[in-house]
Amino acid sequence: MKALILSDLHLDHWSKTQNSTLFNDISNAQVDCVLCAGDACQVNNSQNWELFLSSLRVPCFYVMGNHDAYGTSMLQAREFLHDKAQQCKYFNFLDNNHTIFNGYVIVGSPLYTNFNLFGNGVVESTHPRYKMINDFGYIHNDQESGCITPHDYISLHNQAREYLTKTITEHKDGKVILLTH
């Protein structure tokens, strides 16, 4: 199987000409599918989303990135992407779920950080340096009462990890493609 692998396109930061060139390249790619590991553009930029989705000529399997949710909440961003998957025949949003395509099990999850890179415990959300990370000022929490915190990311990470471990174990004898942000 031939796949076009995309990640962190950040279409919000490109000119119309640059985006047009990219969308043309995606449309003309001689591949069986597109695997996109998130951050195409912010979900509140409907024009870029429509252009991205209209460029698809083969199935696209997509997991959400953190920047997709900038200006909204993780929940609202997921709902937006689920809606787009219903509207666009080539767009498949993988949100801790999987699908089978051409004999491959494509398993998708955002798998955000758990802040435990060195295995020395959980980072406190009150630590000043984490407030400097843009996510914690631009992504609302799901209750819309403030911004997402490191603890929210840790919870999302744990949910994703549990799903991924279970699903990969269930399909260990098959061809598995793991798609995460």
Regions found by a protein language model. Give the residues of each.
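Short, Asp-centered acidic motifs that coordinate Mg2+ and/or phosphate
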Residues: 3, 32-33, 91, 175-177
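Generic beta-sheet signal
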Residues: 63-65, 96, 109, 179
